[in-house]
Swiss-Prot record:
Domain of life: Bacteria
Protein name as annotated: Phosphoglucosamine mutase
GO molecular function terms attached to this record: magnesium ion binding; phosphoglucosamine mutase activity; phosphomannomutase activity
Binding annotation for Mg(2+): S99, D242, D244, D246
Reactions the enzyme catalyzes: alpha-D-glucosamine 1-phosphate = D-glucosamine 6-phosphate
Function: Catalyzes the conversion of glucosamine-6-phosphate to glucosamine-1-phosphate.
UniProt record similarity statement: Belongs to the phosphohexose mutase family.
Gene assigned in the entry: glmM
SUPFAM superfamilies: Phosphoglucomutase, C-terminal domain, Phosphoglucomutase, first 3 domains
Active-site residue numbers: S99
Protein modification: Activated by phosphorylation.
Keywords: Isomerase, Magnesium, Metal-binding, Phosphoprotein
Length: 445
């Protein structure tokens, strides 16, 4: 039984992510982590969705039923859960969030005692326990062995101090006007607080969560709204987080969205110049533009490509011995400060570069010409194994014969197939994308 997608368990709250399934998953997770338990504590945080209350209570029920104590810390960014799990010496951490998805979805992400996301092997073991009725029945405890839960509301300060330490002490944001869009999500307190404490003049939008407005017309998925505020307020930069604040999208002072690959490219070169880039390399995903790779190669930096998902980026970073990586979509990891994508920490790295170089945002993050790319998210009815789709191999050969790079993959969280084409001729890309869409509509829709 497959529960986990590219980033934990995710689905419609009350359906796939129901109270019953969540409690069962919590018990399975507790059983798995019992073998490593040292403090018998598991940390639980969430974003601002209404369904988070239901899921949080179901998690607490399942975990305490198998003997774990639970610490509930309320709305908090995903990277904060990764940090605080290790900082507070918990045996595991759990984040309730569906990231950039609409409010009616929710999800559950798991971290080990060191703040690392679980690998596929660990997820499979939890899935096996989840499906084993006898294992779940036998693991339930009674009497004094049943766990307890408590809520702690002041741990946010630990994370704020940690994040601020990623910003050079020799620099200040004084004189910078920054607009931050918190997506009515988990970063609505931390993001503005950190920027203000570092000296910036801060304009905040998307900081009034009501349980239903997370990501709704705001945040990293809607930078056009941030752009309007940046222009209206004559700000130096705009920063957009997603619902769980593990992603960053930057808007320059002209209201233009900064390409995620170009942001990573500039930061990678800056880190190398300051002696902070380990291994003269970085990890990007198969979605990143070829222009990124060519630009960094000119600066003596090797680009390693992982599968999509910040978890896969982190695993390859560890494998290659590098401390910087990320995704075009805005998940950026600087592992000296965070073990997962961290939108606020990434924002501070970008701001530190602007302050130290004295450049405008529009001038700083446009270091090369990108290859034309087209990305389409095509809704589908079923996810057939790609290798079983008749005619797909011939289609890919046709794409390659046109001198284009392609990536066809299913979304790990939605019923969609993502179609990426990259090449030198934009018109040819459009024509080929039409052919690809027609093909997948015939075979999958």
């Amino acid at each position: 039984m497959t529960l986990f997608g590219t980033d934990g368990v995710r689905g419609k709250a009350g359906k796939k992510v129901s109270a019953v399934n969540t409690m069962r998953l919590a018990m399975a997770t507790g059983i798995y982590f019992k073998q490593f338990a040292k403090t018998n504590k598991i940390l639980v945080g969430k974003d601002t969705r209404r369904s988070g209350y239901m899921i949080e209570n179901a998690l607490v029920s399942g975990l305490t039923a198998v003997g774990f104590d639970v610490i509930q810390i309320g709305p908090m960014p995903t990277p904060a859960i990764a940090f605080l799990t290790e900082n507070m010496r918990c045996d595991a951490g759990i984040m309730i969030s569906a990231s950039h998805n609409p409010y009616y979805d929710n999800g559950i992400k798991f971290f080990d005692s060191e703040g690392n996301k679980l690998n596929r092997s660990e997820e499979e073991k939890i899935e096996e326990i989840f499906a084993d009725d006898d294992a779940l029945e036998d693991a339930q405890v009674t009497g004094k062995y049943i766990g307890k839960s408590k809520r702690i509301d002041d741990v946010i300060g630990r994370y704020i101090v940690h994040i601020k330490n990623s910003f050079p002490k020799s620099l200040s944001l004084a004189g910078k006007r920054v607009v931050i869009d918190c997506a009515n999500g988990a970063g609505y307190i931390v993001g503005p607080t950190v920027l203000q404490e570092l000296g910036a003049e801060v304009v905040v939008v998307g900081d009034e969560p009501d349980g239903f407005n997370i990501n709704e017309g705001c945040g990293a998925m809607h930078p056009e709204n941030l752009a309007k505020v940046v222009l209206d307020k004559r700000a130096d930069i705009g920063l957009a987080l997603d619902g769980d604040a593990d992603r960053l999208v930057v808007v320059d002072e002209k209201g233009e969205t900064v390409d995620g690959d170009k942001l990573m490219a500039v930061l990678a070169v800056h880190l190398k110049n300051t002696g902070e880039l380990r291994g003269d390399g970085m990890v990007a995903t198969v979605m990143s533009n070829q222009g990124l790779e060519e630009y960094l190669l000119e600066h003596g930096i090797t680009v390693y490509r992982s599968a999509v998902g910040d978890k896969n980026v982190v695993e390859m970073m560890q494998e290659k011995g590098v401390n910087f990586g990320g995704e075009q979509s805005g998940h950026i990891i600087f592992s000296d400060y965070a073990k997962t994508g961290d939108g606020i920490s990434s924002a501070l790295q970008a701001l530190a570069y602007l302050v130290s170089t004295g450049t405008k945002t529009s001038e700083a993050f446009n270091p090369y010409e990108s290859y034309p790319q087209m990305l389409v998210n095509l809704p589908i009815e079923e996810k057939k194994p790609l290798e079983s789709i008749e005619g797909l191999e011939q289609l890919m050969e046709q794409v390659e014969a046109e001198g284009m790079r392609h990536l066809f993959r299913y979304s790990g969280t939605e019923n969609k197939i993502r179609l990426l084409l990259e090449g030198k001729n934009e018109k040819a890309l459009e024509t080929m994308m039409d052919e690809c869409m027609d093909f997948f509509k015939r075979t999958l829709v």
